[in-house]
């Protein structure tokens, strides 16, 4: 027989399960500033307008080096971005990025290239970050989060895995135009 305390705990759990939207229950914290998508079928509804504030030119620091990033405004169902990591004035690598509307939500797709423009991924492959949630001035893709500090600055956090060790890397962005 269940005690009244057990019934109360079960009641609260059931209320939380129904009161919290499914898209919120479909994610969990991965690192201090990033989330992972636990249920790919429960992504938040979103459009490119929700992330249009990314458009523009940015520069900043990441991985002990400097970077430049440019995002075009939304058009034709996508936003196109370019990222370049520099060390001592030399290109380390490039990224070509696409934010697209798919499955009623957003995905950020990335292809990486060495300084000589040889691809990291196979021809058809890319890295996909699916939208997990919006939280105030933050947009969280699975393993990658952008926090808008103000109109001129944002911070991004990306999950990196090396030899089984998971860590979070911070990138500080400043708008240049």
PLM ranges: what are they?
Residues 45, 61-142:
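Central antiparallel beta-sheet cores of small beta-barrel/beta-sandwich binding domains
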Residues 88-91, 148, 162-165:
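Short glycine/serine/proline-enriched coil/turn segments at secondary-structure junctions
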Residues 140-158:
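Surface-exposed interaction patches
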Residues 9-19:
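Bacterial N-terminal signal peptides
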Residues 30, 37-40, 121-123, 129, ...:
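Edge beta-strand at a domain terminus
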Residues 42-57:
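N-terminal helix-cap/turn-to-beta initiation motif at the start of protein domains
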Residues 1-4:
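N-terminal secretory signal peptides that target proteins for export/translocation
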């Amino acid at each position: 027989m269940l005690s009244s305390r057990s019934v109360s705990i079960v009641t609260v759990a059931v209320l939380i399960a129904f009161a919290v939207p499914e898209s919120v229950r479909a994610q969990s914290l991965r690192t201090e500033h990033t989330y992972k998508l636990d249920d790919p079928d429960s992504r938040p509804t979103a459009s490119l307008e929700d992330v249009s504030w990314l458009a523009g030119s940015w520069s900043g620091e990441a991985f002990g080096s400097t970077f430049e990033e440019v995002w075009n405004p939304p058009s034709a169902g996508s936003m196109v971005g370019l990222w370049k990591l520099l060390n001592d004035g030399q290109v380390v690598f490039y990224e070509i990025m696409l934010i697209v509307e798919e499955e009623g939500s957003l995905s950020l797709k990335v292809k990486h290239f060495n300084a000589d423009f040889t691809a990291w991924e196979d021809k058809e492959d890319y890295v996909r970050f699916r939208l997990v949630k919006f939280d105030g001035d933050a947009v969280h893709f699975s393993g990658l989060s952008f926090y808008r500090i103000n109109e001129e600055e944002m911070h991004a956090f990306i999950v990196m895995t090396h030899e089984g060790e998971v860590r979070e890397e911070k990138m500080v962005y400043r708008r240049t135009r």
